[in-house]
Amino acid sequence: MSLLLIDWDCIIQSLALLISANSAPILTEKILGNRLNRPIDNDCKLSDGYRLLGNSKTWRGFYAAVFFSIITALCLDLKPIIATLFAILAMTGDLLSSFIKRRMGKPESSQVRGLDTIPESLLPLWLLNDSLSLNAVDITVTIGLFFLCEELISPLLYKLHIRKKPY
């Protein structure tokens, strides 16, 4: 496959996995409320006085991302192991974003454009590019589309009382 060609099927599959993994914690919180809501950082604070990650990063959300991604993969005829790795990498990118934002002194659920979407999308797309048949252009397009989805859909989800913030 030429680097200049865009494989829209692979991009759509990857975008579906990204949306699935990243919406799973939000939807699960909406369904379960505070039940089974244990923070990944176990309330750990670092020497800067800020939490390692914060209350919004939970084991429930992490496992929900894996579960929703596997369901999505099965619907797309992808291997469940790819979906599992994808979700773990996406959530690792999300945790990295939260860690960086806490070190910047930003409160939980604060918005930092780019930092909120790039690590959680770049990490799985880049590390699983062969398994997902993505080239550099496909990865760039997918990240751009994911960013646009987040920017356009988040305010709507906020108005529908699904998200706590409009971003």
How should each PLM-predicted stretch be described?
Residues M1-T84, M91, L95-L127, S133-Y167:
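Interhelical loop and helix-boundary elements at the membrane-water interface
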